[in-house]
């Protein structure tokens, strides 16, 4: 579903065309199809397609604003957010937060999903039930803090890269 803060018909068409070229068979949220609204969301991102976000039980968000994340959670949606900042409103409001860059996360997330395909429904429900986003965010902050302390004591700052495992490894 296309959902833009700065919405225009031209941008929607271009993004929809790009999504179709990438393999999407159905693209929601274009033009008048974005006819519903998320309550408690004031930005243009409140406009949604009633066949998409409103019907979904689980929503994957990247580059999101905290108001929409909160609104989706109030609608009892499972919200999975990809966010670089574990202190952002989106990260704090989401059901599950993956703290990393969305470009790096997507292939890793796809691999994790493939691994979980053979898992029983009962085990998946238990995995979800036992997941604690607050604990995850705390671990991410600990990782970032320890990494910053290490960088402050070495010349690695100039290299400026995350370790090979990245943050996604500890948060998926």
Predicted regions and their residues:
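Long, charge-dense
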Residues: 1-45
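C-terminal functional extensions of proteins
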Residues: 89-172
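A short, gly/pro- and small-residue-rich
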Residues: 66-87
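Active-site glycine-rich loop that binds ribose-phosphate moieties when present
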Residues: 34-54, 60-67
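Solvent-exposed alpha-helices and their adjacent loops that cap or buttress functional pockets
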Residues: 51-55, 71-74, 89-91
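Short, structured coil segments at secondary-structure junctions
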Residues: 22-23, 75-76, 92-93
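Short, well-ordered beta-strand core segments
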Residues: 59-60, 78-79, 97
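Short, acidic/turn-prone active-site loops that include or flank metal/cofactor-
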Residues: 31-33, 84-87, 102-105
């Amino acid at each position: 579903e296309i959902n833009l803060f700065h919405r225009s018909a031209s941008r929607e068409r271009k993004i929809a065309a790009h999504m179709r070229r990438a393999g999407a068979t159905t693209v929601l949220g274009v033009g008048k199809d974005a006819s519903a609204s998320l309550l408690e969301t004031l930005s243009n991102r409140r406009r949604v397609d009633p066949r998409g976000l409103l019907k979904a039980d689980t929503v994957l968000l990247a580059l999101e604003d905290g108001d929409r994340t909160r609104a989706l959670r109030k609608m009892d949606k499972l919200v999975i957010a990809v966010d670089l900042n574990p202190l952002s409103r989106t990260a704090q409001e989401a059901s599950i937060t993956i703290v990393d860059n969305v470009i790096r996360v997507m292939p890793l997330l796809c691999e994790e999903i493939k691994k979980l395909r053979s898992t029983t429904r009962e085990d998946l429900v238990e995995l979800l039930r036992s997941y604690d986003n607050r604990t995850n965010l705390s671990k991410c902050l600990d990782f970032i803090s320890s990494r910053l302390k290490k960088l402050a004591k070495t010349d690695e700052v100039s290299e400026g890269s995350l370790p090979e495992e990245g943050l996604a490894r500890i948060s998926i």
